[in-house]
Design a protein with these regions (language model features):
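Acidic/glycine-rich beta-solenoid
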Residues: 1-260
């Protein structure tokens, strides 16, 4: 399994008997290689038949993942960096101790599972100190009860189809059902056009026009043209996907390749 681009093997994949990815080798520009190894069923309650990832390494860094008995992730550890998570009996995340961002975040929810608050503190695994940021969210009390109405003072409004018409103070215009046609900003508008299948094919923002191209339903590339006082500049981007359909690389202006690199959870 793998991927070949312009005659060069860019990705090779190996799987175990349960079709879980166990190894990936990516050949980057210049010929350097990145090898990702995936291990299942080696941490805490995980068994050999679990689909939950236990650890991942790429030759430079490694990540270990732990879970509770419901399958909720409880910690990610990479060297001295650690992020721990706490979930409630409804499997909702209620606390995140993020040693990477040096923040601890608490979450609360309403009876429908909508987040109602997000409170940020300095990082600690223990007792919380002075709050740094307090974000609140409100929702409709009737009808479509998961429609957010406000976030920290920003209002949200919707049309009859549930499309947001005001998003954090920014007006949005919709057409033909659920197709976003226009975003109205302080400096002007951003306009969108679609084909007969509903795929976005053009975006116009000021003096910049972006056209999108597809292979079936998959975005294969875009061309961005900007008109300026010194002439017109054109930028092209081609997208390449791996055998699993994930974005693998993009080619910028036909000559420079950039690669998507993921952690064990696909981020």
């Amino acid at each position: 399994y793998g991927l070949t681009v312009d005659g060069v093997t860019r990705q090779t994949l190996e799987y175990d008997a349960l079709s879980r990815r166990t190894k990936e080798v990516v050949t980057l520009s210049g010929g350097s290689k990145r090898e990702n190894l995936y291990v299942f069923g080696t941490i805490n309650h995980l068994t050999d038949t679990d689909s939950l990832l236990g650890s991942m390494s790429n030759g430079t860094d490694s990540w270990n993942y732990t879970y509770d008995n419901a399958g909720n992730i409880t910690a990610i550890t990479s060297g001295e960096k650690r992020i721990s998570y706490q979930s409630d009996e409804l499997n909702q995340l209620i606390r995140e101790n993020n040693g990477v961002l040096n923040e601890t975040i608490l979450y609360t929810y309403d009876a429908g599972g909508n987040m109602t608050s997000r409170k940020t503190y300095d990082y600690t695994e223990g007792t919380l100190q002075t709050i740094k940021k307090n974000e609140t969210f409100t929702y409709r009390s009737d009808g479509w009860k998961d429609q957010i109405l406000s976030w920290n003072g920003y209002r949200y409004t919707y049309d009859a189809g549930g499309n947001p018409t005001l998003l954090r103070g920014v007006p949005l215009t919709w057409g033909e059902g659920r197709r976003l046609k226009k975003v109205s900003l302080s400096w002007g508008t951003v306009d969108f056009a679609y084909d007969s299948d509903g795929k976005r094919v053009k975006k116009t923002s000021g003096n910049t026009e972006t056209k999108y191209y597809y292979n079936g339903s998959i975005l294969s590339g875009l061309v961005r043209t900007t008109a300026g006082s010194t002439g017109t500049t054109k930028t092209t981007v081609q997208f390449v996907y791996d055998a699993e359909g994930k974005p693998f690389m993009l080619r910028f202006n036909g000559k420079t390749d950039y690669f998507y690199l993921y952690n064990g959870l696909g981020d």
